[in-house]
Amino acid sequence: MRIAVAGCGAMGSLIGGLLAKDNVDVTFVDPWKAHVDAINTKGLFMEPLGKEGEYVKVKATTDPNSVGVVDVVIFLVKGTKTVEAIKKSLSMINDNTIVMTLQNGVGNTDKIAEYVKKENVAFGVIDFSSTLVGPGHISFQLAEGKIACNTNNGENNPRFNDLIEIMNKSGLHAYVSEDANYKVWKKLVINANFNVLCGILGIKMGELMDEESGWVLMRGITKELVEVANKKGINLKYNDSIEHLRNLGEEVRDHYPSLAQDVARKVPTEIDYINGAVVREGKKLGIATPYNETVYHLMKIIENTYDVGKEFTIEK
């Protein structure tokens, strides 16, 4: 099976690296030339938390047209780049290619399905972490993490099943989950709260949790999100979601979520696929989402004024 990984940041490099380590035919496709060059020169340096790292040989390119048709394309680009990436990847895709998104947020599968056969689209939710240390270098922690996956239409697909088997053999702990969509929305609770609020405020997760006003916002965001999910037939529970926020936040109090890191680097965020998705789905279903809409627009203002700068003083 030939696999291309489109978007080889921290998580894409981990997924592709573990597959390559197990001798799967993998090609990284990413526009970051320094990363691609480092991988082609020395290999991908994979460093498990608390253990010795190792170099893994894997092919990498900035040009998707050089890859040829593959059996699987795994998308891990930022949501803001989904349409651009799928258009550039069409030369790798034919009527038999499985296209799997492991991206954050809601709405990427629909975007991808506009360009490829709907029955070939699959998605998954990742439950482990990875950090891009520098060009050609990642650190990661798998622990008991898994990837819950399913086809977009929920129907059995032998080629998709073959992919899951290969991912499992490579140590990625992938499995077919009937409630994978539930897990997408459960993860959205985390992203819509911690990622976005920490990004807007420039604080760590624990610092947000220590503020009662932070919980006022998180309860409001979560209540709307759960209502939208329930209307879509997804059985999220409000109290369970709040407890999940508390438990996760306590585990990683000193962490700046990925969206906050994007803001710090002044790059586009995935807000359209996080709170923006809640707002869009709410409008379709006739559900008001004022908390999500407010933080969505605040983040848009921040993105649109990156070049203005945030440092200011008030003269006396």
Can you say where each PLM-predicted feature lies in the sequence?
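Helix-loop-beta segment of a Rossmann-like dinucleotide-binding subdomain
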Residues: 93-96, 138-150, 201-208, 255-265
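NAD(P)-dependent Rossmann-like dehydrogenase/reductase catalytic/cofactor-binding core
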Residues: 169, 219-316
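Short, hinge-like loop/turn segments at secondary-structure boundaries
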Residues: 44-48, 117-119, 138-142, 192-194, ...
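Short alpha-helical
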Residues: 34, 80-81, 107, 155, ...
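NAD(P)+-binding Rossmann beta1-loop-alpha1 motif at the extreme N-terminus of oxidoreductases
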Residues: 1-52
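Rossmann-like NAD(P)(H) cofactor-binding subdomain of soluble oxidoreductases
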Residues: 29, 53-137
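Active-site-proximal catalytic alpha-helix in oxidoreductases
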Residues: 181-209, 213-226, 253-254
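Rossmann-fold dinucleotide-binding core
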Residues: 102-183, 187
